[in-house]
């Protein structure tokens, strides 16, 4: 149930972001000559003191660190499961590789590798889906297996395979899971792509392509999860104790294939390359975005420290290393869930930036005081809800995904403060 509502929320969020935000943000940013999200906020609200730039840059660094940690964690799990290595050693080696090509190659290296890695990821997803279905003996057998579990295919109940219990998805739980879609309104790396669109006429085509692709990708991901249970039931992959362990499903499929000749082993290799590609592609993009926020938005724009091009690049490289060290510390636990780490970072960006972006584009009365207050309120609520509310009220009505309450609070604060300080 959680996978279905998350996938649906992301699909809807993608379409709405392209439909409502893309064109307005592209036109507005070109009109005020803004090239980054902190720059857009500062110029849109006439913040000459660059307070908005400073706050937004700090938020970008804070929430890109766990994003980067999730990539390191995934790489560590991959090599640990594949080669029987110690998780910490595997994670450190993976992090070192990413750090090296980010610091030496910079944005060109990340852009080129992202392009190649996206192709590998797509092929890997399709191979996993096809081979997984083939190993079970067709989709009929796949769904026959899962239908035996009460609530597994019921999106209002769900079934926890690890605990062996049927869940209950009420309206509030559904709404909070669908709230994943709200995160798109505040994702800096996605919004930057809107700002960089060259031909406005291609927006409609781009929206259609992006929306269709997300639906296909989310659909395949959900199907892989369903197939994964059947593979587990047939003894092809091990029995997983929890959601964190279940994240090794694709690795285990690849390891199983490697035992059956060169062709199967080659297919398994592509699958593993797809996992590595997805994690490295994510980690390098987040590292460079965070480093850019420090060297450009924070140091040079907010603190008014002028740097030569060489010193700016050096500072960015140092920032990559420092951010990576913090991310490595966060990723040190082999039992941590990649999905949970990503969900926290996603909520942070969605709640801190999403309401501000929407108000900046659609409500003329929004001012810099409202924007700053809303940004801080949304980001802070994510921490409070995640580590205080959900921890102390687990299993109650308050135990919902932190993005929903944080987004609502951030939006409310923007409106209230803007009206009080007009």
Model-derived features with residue positions:
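Membrane-embedded helix-loop-helix hairpins and adjacent transmembrane boundary segments
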Residues: 1-422
């Amino acid at each position: 149930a959680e996978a279905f509502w998350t996938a649906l929320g992301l699909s809807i969020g993608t379409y709405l972001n392209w439909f409502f935000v893309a064109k307005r943000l592209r036109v507005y940013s070109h009109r005020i000559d803004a090239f980054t999200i902190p720059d857009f906020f500062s110029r849109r609200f006439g913040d000459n003191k660059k307070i908005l730039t400073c706050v937004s840059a700090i938020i970008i660094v804070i929430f890109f660190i766990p994003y980067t940690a999730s990539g390191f964690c995934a790489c560590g799990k991959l090599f640990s499961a594949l080669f029987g290595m110690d998780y910490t050693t595997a994670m450190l080696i993976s992090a070192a590789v990413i750090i090296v090509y980010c610091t030496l190659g910079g944005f060109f290296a990340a852009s080129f590798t992202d392009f190649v890695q996206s192709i590998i990821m797509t092929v890997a997803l399709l191979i996993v889906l096809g081979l997984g279905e083939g190993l079970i003996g067709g989709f009929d057998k796949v769904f026959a297996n899962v239908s035996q579990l009460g609530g597994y295919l019921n999106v209002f109940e769900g079934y926890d395979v690890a605990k062996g219990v049927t869940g209950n998805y009420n309206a509030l739980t559904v709404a909070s899971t669908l709230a994943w879609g709200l995160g798109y309104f505040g994702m800096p790396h996605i919004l930057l792509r809107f700002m960089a669109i060259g031909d406005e006429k291609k927006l409609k085509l781009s929206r259609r392509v992006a929306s269709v692709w997300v639906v296909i990708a989310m659909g395949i991901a959900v199907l892989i999860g369903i197939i994964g249970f059947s593979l587990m039931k047939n003894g092809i992959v091990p029995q997983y104790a929890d959601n964190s362990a279940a994240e090794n499903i694709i690795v285990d499929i690849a390891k199983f294939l490697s035992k059956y000749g060169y062709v199967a082993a080659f297919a398994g290799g592509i699958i593993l390359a797809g996992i590595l590609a997805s994690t490295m592609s994510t980690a390098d993009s987040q590292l460079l975005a965070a480093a850019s926020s420090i060297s450009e938005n924070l140091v040079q724009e907010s603190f008014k420290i002028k740097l030569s091009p060489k010193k700016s690049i050096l500072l960015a490289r140092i920032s990559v290393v420092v951010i990576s060290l913090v991310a490595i510390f966060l990723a040190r636990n082999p039992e941590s869930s990649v999905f949970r780490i990503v969900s926290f970072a996603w909520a942070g960006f969605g709640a801190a930036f999403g309401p501000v972006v929407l108000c900046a584009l659609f409500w003329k009365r929004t001012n810099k005081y409202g924007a700053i207050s809303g940004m801080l309120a949304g980001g802070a609520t994510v921490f409070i809800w995640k580590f205080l509310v959900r921890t102390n009220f687990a299993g109650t009505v308050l135990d919902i995904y932190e993005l929903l309450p944080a987004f609502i609070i951030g939006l409310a604060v923007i409106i209230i403060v803007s009206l009080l300080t007009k």
